[in-house]
Amino acid sequence: MGASDSTLAHSRGTLRRLIAVSAEGVASGAPLMVGSRLLQGWLTASGVPLALIGLIPLAELPYTLKLFWAPLLDRWPIPWPDRRRGWLLLMQLLLVAVIAAMALLRPSSDPSQLTAVGLAALVLAICSATQDIAVDAYRTDLLPEAERGAGAAAAALGYRAAMLSVGAGGFLLADRFGWPAAFLSAAALVAAMVPFTLSAPKLAPVEHAITSLRQAVLGPAREFVHRAGPNRTWQLLLLVLLYRWPDGLLNAMAIPFLKLQGFSEADIGLVQGGWAIGATILGTVIGGSLFAWLGMNRSLWLFAISGVIGNLSYWALARFGGGVAGLITAVSLENISSGMVGAVFVALLMSLCNPRFSATQYALLSGVYALSRSP
């Protein structure tokens, strides 16, 4: 095989992996929007009391607690099509069934109907959170180091596309054809990802398969400490905990800050709800593209600096003003830098995982990161 043929084969392999990762991002983002925005809109339109709608976040607890059953995916892999895609396929089929079943329910003040909706939302969250574990593990095991930045960008693009499709598109369908059509379209979107899961690149067999639940539960932490060393373990955990901490603080205070600057709800909604999403996607693509050239260490430093610059754009907005144009500039800079930081952060988490324990280790590292987002 000549050099050009080898390069072409490598490019095709890269493209195939990125398409697979992006498709799994779609499959991951769609159920989350169904269980939050779509469900809230449906219950509100059906006249369900706000006090009951406020309980929806309780059904989303599986997303927070998923690290407790992540070891099960490492211990008992489903061998077909491979150890990660087996779980992906199972969860996607279950998600299609649950979302489609929700379209048949009629939420009202009837306790039996509300109970059915609540149980469906809980099952949806459990299946979706389990799929997220498998998606993270598959992406981690599949992508070589040089492609992890681009893979993070591809996953984010798929995820955002699903959120827009189910969030905005679902409400448009509900307005025109009714809420069952919105849920059925979301189920169809997840179902459309099943062929991508079946045709995605197959993972290489892992050496030294896990043979006990004890090993699946205790092994990930032991292996991580052994591989990194005690001192470096704490350094890495602090990096995971603090690297995106400024983003979390800014996100929590952005809306109150902009209100204090005198911007209207319409201005904030238009810029934060629309423009910011596009800027984040652009930043993720830029970050993923630069990662392959810069590598992990330089990307971590340079993207962190870009994050500081992005955050300072809000200081400049408060100091110098600028009206709506200044708002758009500040939000654009902050979200572009946030997208870049997010791309390298996902690549960092993937690089810290061992393929034997990637489901559990990624879930644990994500849990450490989640602590920085807690109030």
Feature-to-residue mapping (PLM):
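Helix-loop boundary and gating motifs at the non-cytosolic
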Residues: 7-63, 234-239, 243-257, 261, ...
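C-terminal transmembrane helical hairpin of 12-TM major facilitator-type secondary transporters
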Residues: 298-348
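Juxtamembrane intracellular "pre-TM" segments in multi-pass secondary transporters
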Residues: 2-14, 202-236
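Glycine-rich segments within core transmembrane alpha-helices of 12-TM secondary carriers
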Residues: 63-66, 149-170, 174, 366-375
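Helix-to-loop junctions at the C-terminal end of transmembrane segments
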Residues: 65-82, 282-299
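Intracellular juxtamembrane helix-capping segments at the cytosolic ends
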Residues: 129-143, 340-354, 360, 366
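Symmetry-related core transmembrane helices of the 12-TM Major Facilitator Superfamily/SLC fold
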Residues: 90-96, 181-199
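C-terminal ends and interior cores of transmembrane alpha-helices
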Residues: 88-111, 305-322
